[in-house]
Regions:
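Active-site micro-motifs of SAM-dependent methyltransferase domains
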Residues: 87, 106-108, 137-139
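Conserved beta-strand signature within the Rossmann-like core of class I S-adenosyl-L-methionine
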Residues: 127-134
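A C-terminal cap/extension of S-adenosyl-L-methionine-dependent methyltransferases
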Residues: 131, 169-233
């Protein structure tokens, strides 16, 4: 299961698309919860790749120094850089980070996936953490969003990621029948604290996954490297 399309969406598309993320939503809030638990109140630097309207920043602990890059920023600030990171390397000057997060990004990178993993690995400090979300395309009721140009199974995405990172945790965003994130306060509270896969059901009902990973030290060319996946659920 791998479908790659070389049609990439440019700034005009993302100016409108990012408006959908200008208010809090469940995946963002759960990402913030994961990040804050990893940070444990420590002072550190974070890069949000594909930050959109930077809503994540408002849910993070105040000791986390937020930086963001996006192809279509809605605001300008010293901690934000507008760039097309499919046309140019992912970076923020010469800065390196304790945490790099990419939500709703890798469904749109087409054939650039491995290159972007490599660039993110280089941005992390020793002991750093990369957090990436990815849609579960095996969901029983999943409809493929037309702009997606990088469609693959859970296993395919994890194998690719594991060439560059040790995957230490895989967390479902939620388990839902209709492939929509929970909206009621009760259901949000239940799924917000769900950090394990439900046996026999996760592959068909998990909406998305968060992959939490630490960088591998490159010893060979990426094309020759075939490590085992470290998965702790």
């Amino acid at each position: 299961m791998r479908q790659i399309d070389d049609k990439y969406y440019k700034r005009d598309f993302w100016v409108k698309e990012n408006l959908d993320y200008a208010r809090p939503h469940f995946r963002l809030e759960k990402a913030a919860r994961i990040i804050n638990r990893i940070a444990r109140g420590k002072e550190l630097d974070l890069l949000d790749v594909g930050c959109g309207p930077t809503m994540l920043m408002h849910f993070l602990h105040n000791k986390i120094h937020y930086h963001g890059i996006d192809i279509a920023l809605h605001d300008s600030a010293s901690n934000l850089i507008e760039m097309d990171f499919l046309e140019a390397p992912i970076k923020f000057g010469d800065k390196r980070f304790e945490i790099v997060v990419a939500q709703g990004v890798f469904e749109y990178v087409g054939s650039h996936q491995c290159q972007k993993f490599s660039e993110i690995r280089q941005l992390l400090k020793d002991g750093g953490t990369f957090i990436s979300s990815y849609v579960n395309f095996h969901h029983v009721h999943k409809l493929i969003y037309a702009p997606y140009n990088n469609i693959q199974s859970f296993d395919e995405f994890q194998r690719s990621l594991s060439q560059f990172f040790h995957v230490t945790k895989v967390i479902p965003t939620s388990h839902r029948w209709n492939h929509e994130e929970p909206t009621s306060p009760f259901k949000k509270a239940v799924h917000m604290h769900m950090n394990i896969n439900i046996p026999f059901f996760s592959s068909r009902f998990a909406v998305e996954y968060f992959f939490v990973a630490s960088p591998r030290t490159p010893k060979k060319k990426e094309s020759e490297f075939n490590p085992e996946t470290a998965l702790n659920t």
